[in-house]
Curated annotation (Swiss-Prot):
UniProt KW Secreted keyword: yes
GO biological process, one term: positive regulation of estradiol secretion
Keyword Signal: yes
Record protein name field: Gonadotropin subunit beta-2
Encoding gene (name): cgbb
Propeptide segment residues: 143-144
UniProt record similarity statement: Belongs to the glycoprotein hormones subunit beta family.
Natural source organism: Cyprinus carpio (Common carp)
Amino acid sequence: MGTPVKILVVRNHILFSVVVLLAVAQSSYLPPCEPVNETVAVEKEGCPKCLVLQTTICSGHCLTKEPVYKSPFSTVYQHVCTYRDVRYETVRLPDCPPGVDPHITYPVALSCDCSLCTMDTSDCTIESLQPDFCMSQREDFLVY
């Protein structure tokens, strides 16, 4: 009777080791949460053009987990790659009519962190528009 239990314990240990090894291997291939250069578009209601520029955003992989058994009484918190330290820059949009403030301020990521998503400052949706999407006429203004 002692042998089947011993084999089961060894199998569980091997299975656990394989799962841990695969998790570590997978995470080494995924880009970490860090500032990256990205082309983004900024626009403002009332101005006929959007400005396409280069800035630094937070992008990359954060370890998350989701329970196998979900309960309506529990809340799942997913960590996302988001801003830790940020600086704001202001640009002037071209061809804004009189009476419309042509200035717009956008964030520049200085450092990033895996934390809960703050909807006030981040787009936490599953499928969002591309960062360089414009609803109005595009004008390139590529700066870092």
